[in-house]
Amino acid sequence: LPGMWAYRAWQNGSQFVHFSTDAVFDGSSADLYSEDDATGAPSVYGQTKRAGEEAVLSANPDALVLRTNFFGWSNDRARGILDFFANGLESGVLMTGFRDYVVSSVYVGHLFELLIEALSAEGSGIYHLVSSSPLSKYDFGVALAHAMGADADLIEPGLLADNLALSDRGHHLGLSVDKLEALVGHPIP
């Protein structure tokens, strides 16, 4: 479907934006992934997102494909990583944060500001729209605790590798924002 939608946009002369994910990478590199690095998603989710990227760019070479990993509040404050940690910190519940799962999550408000900038700069092709500072899920939770004035000791360090239910995820999915910074003309926070 994404390829079909991208083609229709191209026929109409409309800009097409496709959101993808950091999960297109296998997560085995300690370095930040660039847009040109080989993908190799271990999960069906990442594989299908990569197939969507390819279909979109094949159908519409002017399309903007944004690989992202974002956080924000869900409508019911019960679905995302921000909700998980904030609710636990407010309730005084012990939680586990994975030290070996590193991502470049961007706040959803910043994501949309950067989307507008990328569109205004007439970007096309693949860009990484994420934070410039990768964090482990543990470090994310601790940073949130400090921002909330909550007890960071409620977050215990754990390992994704010990959680068999999540074993198909790459462990280091930090993405480079160099290409996006060049497009928008300023550093990405």
Model-derived segments and spans:
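NAD(P)-cofactor binding segment of oxidoreductase domains
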Residues: 1-17
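Conserved internal alpha-helix within the Rossmann fold of NAD(P)-dependent oxidoreductases
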Residues: 2-5, 53, 115
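Helix C-cap/helix->beta junction micro-motif
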Residues: 8-12, 59, 148
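Catalytic helix-loop patch of NAD(P)-dependent Rossmann-fold dehydrogenases
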Residues: 15, 24-66, 70-72
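NAD(P)-dependent short-chain dehydrogenase/reductase
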Residues: 54-103, 108-110
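Glycine-rich Rossmann NAD(P)(H)-binding loop
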Residues: 74, 96-102, 127-135, 183
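Mid/C-terminal beta-alpha module of Rossmann-like enzyme folds, strongest
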Residues: 114, 121-172
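C-terminal amphipathic/interface module of NAD(P)-dependent oxidoreductases
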Residues: 153, 168-189
